[in-house]
């Protein structure tokens, strides 16, 4: 879901606007990736507004946690100590992992009763 990527950028920006430094911004990004990276896209529709709401509220929450130096560490799923590797892990899921998922979602949507 594109909301995950957009909201992660928002979390970084919110943290910066709150006076956060580079380290705290990486904390916010890690919080976002640990929290909503599993959100899937199931087609553009009114339900997307719900996902945007989840992304925005999670971005704000992640920024607040980051400013308190509370963040998901490398014991949490796809999060690694290095922020670049963490982002690459999310990218791998979006690029490689979602190909089969997209086909499955489309199959479910086209075979509803």
Q: Which stretches of residues belong to each language-model region?
A:
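FAD-binding core of FAD-dependent oxidoreductases
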Residues: 1-11
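Functionally critical mobile loop/hinge segments
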Residues: 7, 14-113
């Amino acid at each position: 879901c594109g909301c995950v990527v957009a909201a992660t950028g928002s979390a970084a920006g919110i943290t910066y606007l709150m006076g956060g430094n580079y380290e705290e911004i990486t904390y916010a990004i890690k919080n976002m990736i640990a929290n909503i990276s599993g959100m899937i896209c199931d087609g553009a529709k009114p339900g997307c507004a719900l996902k945007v709401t989840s992304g925005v509220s999670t971005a704000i929450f992640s920024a607040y946690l980051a400013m308190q130096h509370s963040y998901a560490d490398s014991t949490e799923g796809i999060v690694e100590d290095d922020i670049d590797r963490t982002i690459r892990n999310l990218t791998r899921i979006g690029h490689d992992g979602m190909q089969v998922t997209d086909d499955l979602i489309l199959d479910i949507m086209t075979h509803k009763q």
